[in-house]
Amino acid sequence: MISIILVMIGGGLGAIARSAITDYFNHKFTSKLPIATLIVNLVGSFLIGLTIGLSISISWFPAFFVTGFLGGLTTFSTLAKELTLMMTPKFNINLFLNYSLLQFIIGFIACYIGYHI
């Protein structure tokens, strides 16, 4: 039961952090790519790799930080929505593919680097 509470608290905090980061980047930068989602997913991927690589032995930490906070911070559903919204009558296949590749390949690389630090 404590794990569920830790995931809920961490997830809520991660979602709040994502919302704040998204608001900040949407107001500061204009881009064809959704930069805020890219940033939170890459940072989250790196931190997941780092946390797993460090093998932190605090029993509550993975539930709170990895599953909760980083799960709330990163967002696959927003990525799916953004990719779907790119499929308009003015669909740009290069933008779509570049954004997809940035998210998945660079996300994996960020996780890998975090794991091996």
Curated annotation (Swiss-Prot):
UniProt main location, coarse: membrane
Entry's localization field: Cell membrane
CC per GO annotation: plasma membrane
Mitochondrion keyword on record: no
GO biological process: cellular detoxification of fluoride
Activity regulation info: Na(+) is not transported, but it plays an essential structural role and its presence is essential for fluoride channel function.
The name this protein goes by in its record: Fluoride-specific ion channel FluC 2
